[in-house]
Amino acid sequence: VFVRELVSNASDACDKLRYLSNTKENVMQDDPDLRVEIEINKKENRISFIDNGIGMNRKDLINNLGTIARSGTAQFLKELSESKTKDLSLIGQFGVGFYSAFMVSSEISVTTRKAGEKKLWIWKSDGESNFSIEENDNLDLLKSNRGTKIDILITKENKEYLDKVRVEQIIRKYSDHISIPIYVIDGSEKKDEKNEAINSASAIWTRQKNKITKEQYKEFYNHVGQMFDDPWLTSHYKAEGKIEYTVLNFIPSSKPFDLYDPARENRLKLYVKKVFITDNCPDLIPPYLRFLRGVIDSEDLPL
């Protein structure tokens, strides 16, 4: 859960900086290539999420992370850990995503510097009640002259998140279509070893239909539907109203072997803001359409 949420937050920070660059031309000049890095340090039991997005100042830290000191946070974490339907409910509440990291950590520190500002700040908390914010003069704590680094001290029970392969699997499942490139770096590997972006960074359904070729539709169908044939029919449209959503669905050209099995689940993937939520949502489509393959993505779906 926390991996998906922190990657989404990092991506949002990069998008905010990109938007800011429309009015402030020099804000990205020194470091124009936006990215998200996940660094794993097994020796120190630490995983770090680093972005070169817009960053935060002291006021932003208090407004965005200060609520960690409220008593309701502990109750929220308790409900989240006990929830049997967390894939469909609590996890989808992106506003509280940062707090989910305390489920696997005994301590979190946030090092950040806002774009265009000189001061660097460090926020720390154990997730119990208090947090601290301190100014730091060492600007080399960040790789860029702006952005945020979140250091998470992983508990013994959750060491699976220090496995590079495991983290890469999570990224490919939940954050594959985020437009910002995501890199996973293992601290035990050689420093000169080149890392490639884990995510495909191609949410094809967000593009205009006349910009997508038949071959690109087929490749996406084969990828998302885990099918090897050609789609018999492609349906791609955007619905607007109280809730806006985009649909890219395919009818397979070959009949699934379990088409008439009443226990067969639908294979549509639900996304919110290009972030995967679930592929097990019975109410998404009628049972008689469960042979469909594809995605439904919404910017404002209430989860």
Language-model region placement:
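GHKL/Bergerat-fold ATPase module in large chromosome/replication-associated machines
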Residues: L90, T111-N136, T155-N158, V165-L303
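GHKL (Bergerat-fold) ATPase N-terminal catalytic module, capturing the glycine-rich phosphate-binding loop
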Residues: V1-K156, E160-Y161, Q169
